Amino acid sequence: MAYRLTLLLLLLSLPAHADVTGKARVIDGDTIWIANTKIRLHGIDAPEMKQTCRTSKGKEQLCGQLAKQALQRLIQGQDITCKGDERDRYGRLIAVCYTGPYDLNAKMVRQGWALAYRRYSMDYVDDENAAKVARKGLWRGEFVPPWEWRNK
């Protein structure tokens, strides 16, 4: 109980708005670390690391790993700036992240390696529709949306 209270007080003491800039380490297709800050990319949901999907030819692949690799390629050692003002129940900063002027969250969805997370935001629905029409990333084959896969 004391641990939870301490954690809650720590989270409440954090600034309401946080900009974090630096080199990022990719955890998965929608989570990164910059310095001591764990960041969940706002408005998108990428496959979980152990999640599989199928290619257009029916071959099973680790789509969570592919989403992580896609985010790593987008970042490629560049400085990343993340802007956010909320934290999730795990204490992660919820943020839109940029390489220069480019929205990484949008790029992940536009390339088809993440979905618009409509439960929390409608910001990336157009990007998702474009990826779907162009059959990019996950849209080349068959997959279960990450939020459904987690509930199995």
Describe the role of every protein-language-model region.
Residues 2-4, 12-152:
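Small beta-barrel nucleic-acid-binding modules, primarily SNase/OB-fold domains
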